[in-house]
Amino acid sequence: AEAAGAPISILVNNAGITRDNLMMRMKDEEWDDVLDVNMTASMMITRACLRAMMKARFGRIISISSIVGVTGNPGQANYAASKAGMIGFSKALAAEVASRGITVNVIAPGFIATPMTDVLDDGQKEGLLGRVPMGRLGEADEIAATTVFLASKEAGYITGGTLHVNGGMAML
């Protein structure tokens, strides 16, 4: 956008990988890979976009976290730490930039029908769905619609928040 002459006004941090393993078996590379992609890259991209947003006195920064960043999940200490870190990062950043017309929010999806969940066997899917009061996986379009809302003018008074889109998992 900036190369085309328009400043960046909306940033969605949605990169995310997993390298699941029990902590006692987790390799340093598995930890580092997940933190580098899920947290450090988001920080670097956010920092690169902030100057233009500050100058324009407007911006929307939306980070995609996960229910796992709030609840934890066995075998995903690295992923949970990275997604919880995104929530803390976003709250701190929201406090820094709110007076400049920039909102910073987080979406914490539950289990969404994606290639990551497609690899689960029927037993694993059944176990997941048992933790979702709505009894189904979410759809990518539901996360996209939430992102569009947080980027909109109508969400201009929402900052520092985490919006849970998880079929009710956060209430359990």
Q: Would you name each region that the model predicts?
A:
Residues 22-23, 30-35, 117, 128:
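Substrate-binding pocket helix/loop in short-chain dehydrogenase/reductase
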Residues 21-24, 71-77, 99-100, 135, ...:
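Active-site loop immediately N-terminal to the catalytic Tyr-X3-Lys motif
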